[in-house]
């Protein structure tokens, strides 16, 4: 923090520091709108209020807990749980109250600018300080006494307002950059999904309708992963496959995992399909030999009937996923049984056409993955820039 700014406690800067209570403890019910808007820690984002799922309580709650009735401009900070220290300003005119997980910091407007305080409490330095002072009982929490005694650097009001103005402008530019990156990624995903569906809903000349059982099979048998010959083979479970992408994560050998129950052998010619929770769309093309969980189907494509790449994309298609989900729903269990899997019917082109279509899908998928990677990099860079700006602001360097 800047050495040139005086220090003040929040107890001296706020006319009220308090928190709410639980309606259930007070004998009140949650109600449908209209009622008293009831703010919980879920509604307090970082520098923004989140009301996609608002809650309401009986009007009489405000008579019982009048101390925590909100006013426009109140600084709200989360006192409990994973979002501890997350701070935003209540920017609505709705009559509202809060629960025990949210604290009110009602500033004296002639002493501290509420938006300056919100930015300060959301800064990396103060987030770290708040976490250092958590009291870990059943859930991490911060006390009102801690906030009353919390010392903050306090530049003159005009300087506070200037700093907020600079941060507002900078953060607006960052939000625009983030929105543009997200839009580019959404467009790429939409293009891939559109092309994927167009491939698997068309029926060209010479295409033949076939069941999955006509074009692939499960040829593997269960083996004991404790045997020496299998111990150093890589194991793939549903948790090791990324949804919709087919990427592998956190792979280990049978020895490293200490596997006991039976597993299927697979090789590089197969497609792995997770039969558990088909809506997750976990399908993969391994480029190695290994073992897979009994909750997966190692599918061997039939030569001259279907290519491995075409089978991979077919199992990721919307039509197959809907079919798989419907089958698991009828069975009353979130998994696809073998009989239902192989009964799936689809119009298939010749192998040459399959190779062409699968190649096009792979190219689009690679481009989508590239944009996904760029998006993640940009997100990380923007987050780092935000932290840097907040740090510079409260060091007096803006």
Place the predicted regions along the sequence by residue.
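Short, surface-exposed loop/turn microsegments at beta-strand edges and helix-strand junctions
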Residues: 27-36, 48-57, 67-70, 88-100, ...
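Sequence-specific dsDNA recognition surfaces
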Residues: 11-27, 42-72, 213-225, 236-268
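Short, ligand-facing micro-motifs at secondary-structure edges
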Residues: 44-56, 75-99, 115, 119, ...
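Short, conserved charged micro-motifs
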Residues: 111-115, 305-309, 355
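Non-catalytic DNA-recognition/assembly elements of restriction-modification systems
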Residues: 1-21, 149-165, 172, 176, ...
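A short glycine-rich beta-alpha junction/loop motif
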Residues: 3, 29, 79-80, 95-103, ...
